[in-house]
Amino acid sequence: MSDSRPYFDDEYGGRYILVEPGDFRMGDSSGTRSEQPPHSVSILEPYFCGERPVTQAHWQSIMGLNPSAFTDGWAAGLRPVEQVSWDDAQEFVSRLNELDQGAERLGITGEWRLPSESEWEYMARAGTTTRWAFGDRDSDLNDYGWHAGNSGASTREVGQKKA
């Protein structure tokens, strides 16, 4: 981890980083209709958010199955889980809360939940106002994320790109 924000690691291999409250501009004036117009949003409470997507191995350890389509190869468990709905994700969180009931991390006893759309965008923007958290140049996207143009038509192991 390159910064000094508080974090904790769970027993499933996940790292969760503290996101402090703050204000930001949410939306994109040149984006889809649902992203317009940009507007000010305040995040009022701190929260912890996963540093990486939930892996297939983590999902299977909690849910007892792996619904993902891209399961070939020795590193499949390190790939992000996919083929899950919002309802599936809510069930995952519910089961995680059952398993973790009363667990204390960094002196805090809390519950797992999905971030709101505002919380997710605030965290993903990382204090920037550019199109991407790393800037405005599409040509830099290959360094920061997997997509149809560089993934070989498959998901890839989490944590392989710049943060």
How would you label these PLM feature ranges?
Residues 8-68, 84-87:
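A short glycine-rich, aromatic-capped structural motif
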Residues 38, 44-46, 76-78, 153-155:
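Short, solvent-exposed beta-strand edge segments and adjacent coil->beta transition regions
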